[in-house]
Amino acid sequence: MSGTMSGTLAEASQQLRGQTTAFLNFCRIEKGLSLNSLEAYTADLSRFKEFNDKLEGLPGTAEIRIYIDHLYQSGLSNRSVGRHLTTLRSFYGFLLREGLIQTDPTEHLHAPKQWQTIPKYLNLEEINRILQAPDLTRPTGLRDRAMMELLYASGLRVSELCKVGMGDLDLSFQVLRTTGKGNKQRLVPVGTEAIQAVEAYLQSGRAGLLKGRASRFLFVTARGGCMTRQAFWKLLAGYGRKAGIFQGLTPHVLRHSFATHLLEGGADLRSVQIMLGHADISTTQIYTHVMRSRLRDTVEKHHPRA
């Protein structure tokens, strides 16, 4: 344990609680993080505090390493453990900058290697099947088709898709404005088929769902509220079963499909990074399976001794 962070179990628990509150307030007020990010930070730090409450005092590097091992043993994936460690790094980085601690116990800890397997994505035939699944004679079917088309056409996160406002999509210029992680705005081009699906929903579906009510959101429920991530997730899984795609169809699979098909079509990694809203291109490099395949095809096609 570090020198100034000793004390009784109760004192340590209270101190950690106060530090956590200060960090979350900083993330909410000064960094302007989204509700989703705040909820993730809160959940990660609550789990960390629950583990730490069993220790005597506040944790140092050795204790945090034990905690990381504990997460592995509980069955979390490399990606999830990596996210927990990222949360702790942000937390202790804040405490260090504020002068609340003298050393950062996470400084020499390394995140696990992520994405050891290729992200799951659909092929073009599967994409067509899933997009044809909604019943376009119903307002909900028009909405669901428009949401899936827009998600596949833009690579939005599901939280971004659900929060698209009426003024965020320019149908004439075929461009969408969205606010991603860290309150960062980006403009994403949208293809003609997605635009047409949204127009059909606006013309024949949305008013039937609202029934005279007003909403600033583009995609609404039968009760006139904003479509939630959980509701869309459930709808998409249902369409997956209808289309014969049973295993693990989530909104993120459509996002992965968007990125994969762009790269297969010749887009560069930097452009895909911008459209996905990744702050660091290393995140986008999970799609290097496509780049490797394309390079291999290029060599086989053009090298005289391939």
Q: What positions do the PLM features span?
A:
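Conserved catalytic core of the tyrosine transesterase superfamily
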Residues: 1-306
